[in-house]
């Protein structure tokens, strides 16, 4: 109370009553959902799961003024163009659409590849550049046009590509072999400013699956190894002559004061070239090709992986006669390099096969460590892959800005000779049973006749066994699907990281080695046996088998994960079934890339369910039909 005995009046509140009541009242659910949807942002896909848009674009960095940079008080001096603040702005696309006017300098976007662009899984290379590359390599039609050593050139048809009548280089081989055979004109002298920059040449080989990338880098590497071996022999001969002269002079001057000779450094465990691959299965496959060329070219090669015993790895790498070309996995080679630092002291050529995997998060630290240790003697770094993700492209532009990019016209495309079919598992008779749909497709393919003729002696040769690959997304489902297929009378096996190493080699051998054509002796024996059966007047007793009607004959199925989707040369496979829709178009390319190799035809089948992206499958199928890159 004041002096007059009255109560003071309350002060007016700083916030009105309407605002106070509005703050205490919660928003209705419909408005809350609207507000949350309005503030939500679309998340960008991970860079390692999306392909780069500018694979063939050179790494040229242009300095541009940032949008947030403000002009100072003296920014108007020495200007050739006036910056008028009230300059009329161009109308936005939304305003033009509302007014019904056509957009300026823009073309109507085709609805094709809409879903793939939303995923940003594949990215384009301009088709003008593709046409220029085609015109550039059109004149190269034979391996004789390459500046290879005669012994290397003669070994291509006999060792690298046996059994082929028409031996012609593929597009990536026409691009890569001449560039990789080039010798550096002048060697770089390291300066203080260029200490961090690599002093070796870098190459990126980007080509579609099954295009012969292995032979594209292997032939120049073998050629360089043989040339370097010849140079070393000449230098060694000169050094021995000089040492002999010095020894004679010392003997004349000081007959009793002779210094002990220093033994030369052994070449054991010091390869000239190293090929790194991500898996032990690829080590075996690439190692066989390297070994085949060594029979005629004469060099020492070896392969090491975790599937081999320590004694065999030691005998292969540290052979007293030395080693020229080594095929290995990064983790095993890095562990050996920690205890034996001289392993990487003589490497002149380093190849990263499946570079998108070797420079991913799991392999990047180990691979980078190997490159840095081999850098003092390294002359050429070669990276090759069928898919170039954005993460790899950004890494190359940052770390190797001067890398030479050799890309083929059909990069990020699936060959047109591969047909893609779609099976909706939600319809009758499957009703959502994906395993039942897979078994039904395999039975249909197994019962159907082979489209390719076996030649004039087809009736005298045993029927060809059909090989089918089934890809699943999860490792645990490989065994489950294989067990279900076996219960339906299908000869199915599973292959994953959980499988035994020896079992993996045996299984892959059945699906990677194509059976050779029948020899004349086999044809004559089959003819003789058939004439003998036709001459018997009565019917021969046949083997009775109760389950013969429930078994699918002449068909073998391999249920696997992405373990067999990269680099495995599955020449014997003509059919691939995608049990699940792949997560990205990168997986689409690698899984369907097991087909159409060496110019052969193939067929792919995708099982599509209720929750799968049917729009992505549709656009991939249309892109394959058009023969375009999956953009």
From Swiss-Prot:
Cited InterPro entries: DEAD/DEAH_box_helicase_dom (IPR011545), Helicase_ATP-bd (IPR014001), Helicase_C-like (IPR001650), P-loop_NTPase (IPR027417)
Domain notes, please?
The Q motif is unique to and characteristic of the DEAD box family of RNA helicases and controls ATP binding and hydrolysis.
Binding residues for ATP: 207-214
Q: EC class of this enzyme?
A: hydrolase
Q: Which reaction(s) does the protein catalyse, per the Swiss-Prot or TrEMBL entry?
A: ATP + H2O = ADP + phosphate + H(+)
Sequence motif: DEAD box, positions: 353-356
From which source organism is this entry? Neosartorya fischeri (strain ATCC 1020 / DSM 3700 / CBS 544.65 / FGSC A1164 / JCM 1740 / NRRL 181 / WB 181) (Aspergillus fischerianus)
Q: Give a short account of what the protein does.
A: ATP-binding RNA helicase involved in mitochondrial RNA metabolism. Required for maintenance of mitochondrial DNA.
Report the protein name in the record. Answer: ATP-dependent RNA helicase mrh4, mitochondrial
Q: Name one Pfam family in it.
A: Helicase_C
Predominant location = mitochondrion
Which residue numbers delimit the Helicase C-terminal domain?
455-631
Gene name for this UniProt entry: mrh4
Question: Start and end of the transit peptide?
Answer: 1-45
Report the GO molecular function annotations.
ATP binding; ATP hydrolysis activity; RNA binding; RNA helicase activity
Q: Which family does it belong to?
A: Belongs to the DEAD box helicase family. MRH4 subfamily.
């Amino acid at each position: 109370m004041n002096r007059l005995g009255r109560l003071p009046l309350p002060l007016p509140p700083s916030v009105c009553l309407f605002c106070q009541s509005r703050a205490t009242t919660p928003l209705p659910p419909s408005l809350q959902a609207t507000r949350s949807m309005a503030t939500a942002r679309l998340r960008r896909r991970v860079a390692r799961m999306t392909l780069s848009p500018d694979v063939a674009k050179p790494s040229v960095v242009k300095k541009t003024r940032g949008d947030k940079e403000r002009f100072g008080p003296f920014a108007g001096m020495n200007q050739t163009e006036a910056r008028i603040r009230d300059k009329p702005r161009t109308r936005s696309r939304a305003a033009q659409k509302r007014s019904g006017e056509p957009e300026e300098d823009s073309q109507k976007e085709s609805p094709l590849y809409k879903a793939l662009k939303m995923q940003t899984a594949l990215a384009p290379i301009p088709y003008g550049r593709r046409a220029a590359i085609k015109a550039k390599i059109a004149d190269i039609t034979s391996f004789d046009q390459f500046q290879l050593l005669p012994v290397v050139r003669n070994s291509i048809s006999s060792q690298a590509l046996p059994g082929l009548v028409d031996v012609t280089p593929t597009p990536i081989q026409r691009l890569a072999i001449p560039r990789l055979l080039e010798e550096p004109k002048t060697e770089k002298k390291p300066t203080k400013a260029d200490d961090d920059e690599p002093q070796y040449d870098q190459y990126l080989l980007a080509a579609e699956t099954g295009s012969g990338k292995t032979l594209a880098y292997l032939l120049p590497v073998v050629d360089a190894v043989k040339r370097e071996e010849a140079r070393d022999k000449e230098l060694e001969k000169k050094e021995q002559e000089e040492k002999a002269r010095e020894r004679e002079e010392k003997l004349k001057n000081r007959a009793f004061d002779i210094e002990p000779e220093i033994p030369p450094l052994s070449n054991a465990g010091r390869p000239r070239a190293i090929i790194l691959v991500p898996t032990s299965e690829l080590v075996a496959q690439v190692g066989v090709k390297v070994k085949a060329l060594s029979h005629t070219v004469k060099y020492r090669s070896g392969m090491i992986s975790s599937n081999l015993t320590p004694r065999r790895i030691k005998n292969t790498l540290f052979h007293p006669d030395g080693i020229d070309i080594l095929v290995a996995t990064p983790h095993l080679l890095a562990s050996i390099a920690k205890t034996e630092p001289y392993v990487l002291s003589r490497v002149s050529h380093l190849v990263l096969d499946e570079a998108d995997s070797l420079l991913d998060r799991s392999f990047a630290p180990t691979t980078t460590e190997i490159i840095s240790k081999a850098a003092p003697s390294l002359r050429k770094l070669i990276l090759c892959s069928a898919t170039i993700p954005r993460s790899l492209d950004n890494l190359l532009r940052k770390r190797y800005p001067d890398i030479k990019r050799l890309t083929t016209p059909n990069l990020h495309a699936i060959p047109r000779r591969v047909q893609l079919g779609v099976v909706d598992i939600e319809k009758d008779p499957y009703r959502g049973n994906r395993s039942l749909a897979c078994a039904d497709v395999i039975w249909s393919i197994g019962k159907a006749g082979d489209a390719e003729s076996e030649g004039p002696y087809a009736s005298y040769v045993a029927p060809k066994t059909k090989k089918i690959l089934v890809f699943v997304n999860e490792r645990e489902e490989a065994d489950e699907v294989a067990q279900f297929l076996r219960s339906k009378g299908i000869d199915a096996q599973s292959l994953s990281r959980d499988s035994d190493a020896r079992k993996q080699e045996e299984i892959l051998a059945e699906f990677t080695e194509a059976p050779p054509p029948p020899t004349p002796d086999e044809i004559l024996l089959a003819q003789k046996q058939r004439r003998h059966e036709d001459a018997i007047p009565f019917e021969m007793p046949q083997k009775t088998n109760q389950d013969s009607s429930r078994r699918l004959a002449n068909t073998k199925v391999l249920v696997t994960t992405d373990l067999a989707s990269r680099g495995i040369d599955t020449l014997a496979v003509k059919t691939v079934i995608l049990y699940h829709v792949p997560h990205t178009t990168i997986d689409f390319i690698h899984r369907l890339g097991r087909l159409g190799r060496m110019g052969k035809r193939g067929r792919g089948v995708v099982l599509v369910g209720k929750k799968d992206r049917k729009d992505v499958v549709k656009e991939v199928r249309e892109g394959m039909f058009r023969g375009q890159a999956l953009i």
